[in-house]
């Protein structure tokens, strides 16, 4: 389902919404027809009304809620909003968008994964032109240890550590004020996403490009 407020449109990402429903497409198109105001933001809600727009859930759900029903333009609208929040976080600026948990260390990696799905559906050349700079900027940010909870080790793997004992993965259940499953170190899904992101980022660049070769070398190191 789609909810719209004055200048913000949100898509509900929950079991209630299924891509196979033919009614979703005309609903979304009808909504887009009258919300082309300047600076409109689009969000994906993790659940309504109990959850807000969460960064990790946004990037995981985005391809299925848009690309799989040929709503490529809506993918771009949601990603446009999310990219602002991502760049603000990477630059240490206040977040001006209503996307929560943008600080989770795997969020930038899931963003690249979502963009990779866009490349599969819309073509690598189009993806490189539209999102190539964002992908490379994210990879450079992570490699330079810009994220406070991620560190790239000499073995090419990402090491994750929470700053104050908070949850840094999707396994965030708490009992008696403590994490049920605290996870730190070489978290498997983080590094799977990292390896994938390196090779995908390299594939968006031309043969012989120095950055492409560097990303491939980092990926090869991580693979060992």
PLM regions: where:
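Acidic, mature catalytic/reactive cores of soluble proteins
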Residues: 1-224
